[in-house]
């Protein structure tokens, strides 16, 4: 088992996107999460990865967890796409954090999934704090970080619950959340506009240990962009000229800083990639741009591996 190899034929098989939800009472499930994984031939790779990283002990205890479990086929595809020939080839600390990105503290049944954010057990390279995971639930179909879908739910265990997923959930960057969260649809459209002379997706995907990461992103929600277009007398994001769009987007990003909401204070001067802004917290957190326009911070501390996102309700504009 030490040099467990990929069966590449798994990758050639098709995936099913329907979700089967088990209806099994936890009281009738004396097996732990680890026992369930060990007992299933579908999770051979996952079981080996858990054993290799020492996480098997965590999932064999009494504390409650929710595990998003990739099957052998899914693990095989992940290894192949990332240039690994076996689980042993994945650096152990990286493998451990990826696995922890599939673990949420507490028991979360399938019916209780709601669109929003939760925290995983994975730790951000930028802060050492737990990372966020975006959950989207539409018509009882659950997608995680915009990439992995639950295909079988509610495999009950004595210490939690298992949901099978059809993709390994990568460690999120700030870009992951911008593209996964429907509240950032307009922002995602803006940062991916083809005529931008700076590749913001590439920049904001930089590893936390490399400059200009980590990042603090003040991310305008969809309503903020709608109101901006009205303010500017424009009909679409495509009507904003490239220089203005570029300077506006970079004005929402602080480089080499992972500023949590707890670190904000009144009259705090912050330097973004596009100029200075001022943070305030009395009466509700907000930021003020160089034109004295105030944007409220409506959600905070969406933690990625390379930075943090705070959601704002108005697009800020540089001088």
What do these predicted ranges mean?
Residues 4-6, 19-319:
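Mature, structured domains of secreted/extracytosolic soluble proteins
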Residues 1-17:
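Sec-dependent bacterial lipoprotein signal peptides
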